[in-house]
From Swiss-Prot:
Enzyme class: hydrolase
Gene3D superfamilies: FomD-like (2.40.380.10)
Keyword Repeat found: no
Protein name according to UniProt: Probable ribonuclease FAU-1
GO molecular function: mRNA 3'-UTR AU-rich region binding; RNA endonuclease activity, producing 5'-phosphomonoesters
Name of the gene: fau-1
The EC number(s) this enzyme carries: 3.1.26.-
Job of this protein: Probable RNase involved in rRNA stability through maturation and/or degradation of precursor rRNAs. Binds to RNA in loop regions with AU-rich sequences.
Example GO biological process: rRNA processing
Keywords, ordered alphabetically: Endonuclease, Hydrolase, Nuclease, RNA-binding, rRNA processing
A Pfam short name: RNase_E_G
Alphabetized PANTHER family for the sequence: PTHR39159, UPF0374 PROTEIN YGAC
Transmembrane helix is among the record's keywords: no
C-alpha cells in the first residue's frame, strides 16, 4: 500500500493537493479536507505527518523511506524554500562516546558527525554510553538532546526502556477511549520495567493490532539492547528512529501553495502569507474568498486588501522588520516609521525611517556608526532587494543592499528570507559584492536550493551594474 500521510494546519489543502497529485494517500483527514477532495474515510496509521511548525515553516516527520520522500517531493514543488533536515533521526538509538564534560552534562559523539548533550551525566570521558535522541538537531548550530530512556517507535505505540511510564497522545481526547487504550497497554507491559507511549493513531486501532505491535517492539528493543552489549566500536547507530525535517516557507513558496490551493477552492493572492497573521487578518481572508466565490474579481480583492494593509501601516507608530536567515534564526531589526509609500504598476514601495541607537561600524562600509544616524530602508513589493541607506544629517554615509526573497508586506510587519549575499556601496561610489562565500556554503549544505542560489547571484551582479539607481536620497525624492 502506498505511503499514508496525515496533513494538518493552514497549509493542509495545498499540501494535500500536492501529495495526492503525486500518488500519496491522505489518512486521518479532517472533515473539510475529505469534503474538498471527495476522499473516503481512511483511519489507517500515518507513515508521515506534515504540519505547521510555525507561521513560516512546515514540519515533516515519519518513518524513513516514507517521510524523506514526502519531504523531497514537497521541496521540489515549492522550489524557493529553505531546507533543514536533521542528520540523525528523532528517537534514533546510538552507542555513543563521551567526548567532554560540562558541569553535570556529557558531550556525546553519536555518529554522522553529530555530538549531543546528555543531561545529568557523571560518566568519564572516553566511556561508551547507550543513548536515544530526544530532540533532533534540525537547524545549523542546534545540538541533539540525548536521553538514557531509549525508545523504538511503531505506528500505534512506542516502547520505552529506562522510563517505566504509561503516556498517551494529547490528540486522543475522548476519555473513554483513553482509558480503554491505557488499559490495553498496561496489561502488556505490567512487570516488564518498560514504558509505553500510545500514539494518536492508536485511537483507530483494534486491541489485537495494539497488542501485536507492543510484542513486536518489545522483541525489537530486546535485540537492540543485546546488540549494544557486543559492540566494540563507538559511536555506532543502532536504530534510525524517525526522519524529521523543516521546510522554510519563503514568500515565493507561499505563492506556490496559493496556486495549489486555488486548484481545489477559490483562493486569493497571498492567502498563505496573510493567513499567517493575526486572527483579524485571517477572518478578512476568509471573507475575501467568499467574495471571490461570488464573482468579485481577484484583482479588485487584492487591490482592496493591499490598500487596507497600507492604510493600517500608515496609522501605526512603528513597523516591525523580521529577517529570517538560512541558519533558521529569526532576527527582528529595530523598527521603523513610515517615511514614504509609493504605489505604481510595479507594486508598492515603502520607505521606512529607522533612527539608529548603537555605536559601531557599518558592515562592509568601514564607516563609524553613531547614535542618531538614520537608515532609510527601501522595501519594494516583488523585489529581491532591500536597501539600507545610511545618513548623518544630510551626509550620505553609504548604502547596504540586502539580497533576499521578495518581502511579505503585512499589517505592522515586513518579513523576508535573507539570501546572505549583499552589495555595499561606499560614499565614494565604489560598489562590491560581499558574503558570496556564505551563500555558497549554505547552497553546498543544501539548505538554499539551486534556484535561490542562482537567483541571488544574478541579482547581485545586476546590482553592481545599476547600483547608482538604487541609492535612496531623501532630499531628492
Amino acid at each position: 500500500m502506498c505511503t499514508g500521510v496525515r496533513v494538518r494546519g493552514i497549509t493542509a489543502t495545498a499540501v494535500s493537493k500536492i501529495l495526492l497529485d503525486k500518488g500519496y494517500r491522505i489518512v486521518q483527514a479532517s472533515n473539510i479536507i475529505r469534503e474538498r477532495f471527495n476522499l473516503p474515510l481512511d483511519t489507517s496509521p500515518a507513515d508521515v505527518t506534515v504540519k505547521d511548525a510555525d507561521k513560516d515553516e512546515l514540519l515533516v516527520l515519519g518513518f524513513y523511506g516514507h517521510a524523506d520522500k514526502v519531504y523531497n517531493d514537497l521541496v521540489d514543488e515549492l522550489e524557493y524554500s529553505f531546507k533543514w533536515v536533521s542528520p540523525v533521526g528523532l528517537h534514533s538509538i546510538h552507542l555513543g562516546l563521551i567526548r567532554d564534560r560540562v558541569g553535570d552534562k556529557c558531550i556525546v559523539e553519536i555518529g554522522n558527525n553529530v555530538k549531543g548533550v546528555l543531561p545529568r551525566c557523571n560518566m568519564d570521558i572516553g566511556k561508551k554510553v547507550l543513548v536515544g535522541v530526544a530532540k533532533a538537531p534540525i537547524k545549523p548550530g542546534e545540538e541533539a538532546l540525548l536521553t538514557r530512556s531509549i525508545r523504538v517507535v511503531g505506528k500505534y505505540v512506542s516502547i520505552i526502556y529506562g522510563k517505566p511510564s504509561l503516556t498517551i497522545s494529547e490528540h486522543i481526547r475522548d476519555h473513554d477511549k483513553r482509558e480503554y487504550l491505557l488499559a490495553i497497554a498496561m496489561s502488556k507491559i505490567m512487570g516488564s520495567g518498560l514504558g509505553v507511549h500510545l500514539r494518536s493513531s492508536s485511537q483507530y486501532a483494534g486491541k489485537d493490532e495494539i497488542e501485536r505491535e507492543i510484542d513486536e517492539l518489545k522483541q525489537k528493543l530486546r535485540e537492540l539492547l543485546d546488540k549494544a552489549k557486543h559492540i566494540e566500536d563507538a559511536p555506532t547507530i543502532l536504530y534510525e528512529g524517525e526522519f524529521i525535517g523543516l521546510i522554510g516557507l519563503t514568500s515565493l513558496a507561499k505563492e506556490k501553495l496559493d496556486s495549489y490551493r486555488d486548484k481545489v477552492v477559490p483562493t486569493i493572492t497571498r492567502h498563505h502569507s496573510l493567513k499567517s497573521c493575526d486572527n483579524v487578518m485571517s477572518d478578512i481572508v476568509d471573507y475575501s474568498e467568499i467574495l471571490l466565490r461570488h464573482g468579485i474579481s481577484r484583482k479588485i480583492i487584492y487591490d482592496a486588501l493591499s490598500d487596507y494593509i497600507l492604510e493600517k501601516n500608515r496609522s501605526l507608530p512603528k513597523i516591525r522588520i523580521i529577517h529570517i536567515k538560512p541558519d533558521g534564526t529569526t532576527h527582528t531589526l529595530s523598527p521603523g516609521t513610515i517615511y514614504e509609500i509609493v504605489k505604481s504598476e510595479k507594486g508598492v514601495k515603502i520607505v521606512l525611517k529607522r533612527t539608529l541607537r548603537n555605536i559601531g561600524v557599518y558592515d562592509g562600509l568601514g564607516v563609524e556608526k553613531k547614535p542618531g544616524d538614520i537608515d532609510y530602508m527601501v522595501i519594494e513589493e516583488n523585489s529581491w532587494i532591500i536597501s539600507h541607506n545610511y545618513y548623518r544629517g544630510n551626509e550620505w554615509l553609504g548604502s547596504y543592499i540586502n539580497i533576499n526573497t521578495p518581502p511579505e508586506i503585512l499589517p505592522g510587519i515586513i518579513k523576508y528570507h535573507d539570501l546572505l549575499i549583499d552589495v555595499i556601496v561606499k560614499n565614494t561610489g565604489e560598489a562590491r559584492i560581499i558574503d558570496e562565500e556564505e551563500l555558497k556554503t549554505y547552497y553546498e549544505k543544501e539548505i538554499i536550493p539551486e534556484k535561490l542560489y542562482e537567483k541571488a547571484l544574478e541579482v547581485a551582479k545586476s546590482i553592481l551594474e545599476n547600483h547608482r539607481l538604487l541609492i535612496y536620497r531623501p532630499n531628492q525624492q
